Amino acid sequence: MRGAEQAGWQVLTDGREWHASPLPLPADPAAWYQLAAVGGWQAVLADTAHSVPNDVLSSRYDGSRGQTRGWYDLPYSVPVLCAAATADGVQALQRTAMTLHAEGIPLQRSVAVLVATADGRSPGAVRAAATVLTSQAGAVLTVPHDPHIRAHGLRNPAKLSQRGQQAAASLAQAVLTVAGKAWGDPLPPARRPAAFPLVISQGGNRP
């Protein structure tokens, strides 16, 4: 999270061990938008996990809005769709792209990320799928394998590999570029909640 007048970033975390189960966080995307407004943060990175195709199809079946559409409906949001850089991973990402397109959800306002699961060059099927997705999504990137993240998360960003840091910078720039194409550059300042008037009660007897 980053404030409009802050030079650095702030991290809101529970401080638990990397292998601990995640906290039960609110599923409604609007809750994260309200949190950003209350904190006065200009940019917020919310790390969530749900199966996009299953969510979209389930919401169509039961007539609900669904988490995926909720994220896309938020002002100035750029969803980052992640999948493993494997044959199964790109197939899942392709199914996601087709599902979003069928539901009229703007895939071009998304960034697709293929995460390498091992060192070395990505398989040919992965590279071919990434080429096809480039014409559909706002941007397609590949994040190299970094065993430090797998073992320790982001507790010490200074220990990330140089390739990993470059990939993170490229991802951040891709998100900003997609946002700029959708809403203009520069983006408007983050919304702030209206201040409540201070009411001081004086006198009177309590029942």
Predicted regions mapped to residue ranges:
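NTP-binding/hydrolysis catalytic cores, primarily Walker-type P-loop NTPases
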Residues: 155-207
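Structural motif
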Residues: 43-47, 80-82, 113
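P-loop/Walker-type NTP enzyme "switch/lid" segment
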Residues: 1-63, 151-159
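Inter-motif core of Ras-like GTPase G domains
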Residues: 39-40, 56-87
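Beta-strand-loop-alpha "switch" segments that mediate conformational coupling across diverse proteins
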Residues: 116-162
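Conserved Switch II/interswitch segment of TRAFAC-class P-loop GTPases
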Residues: 50-53, 76-94, 119-121
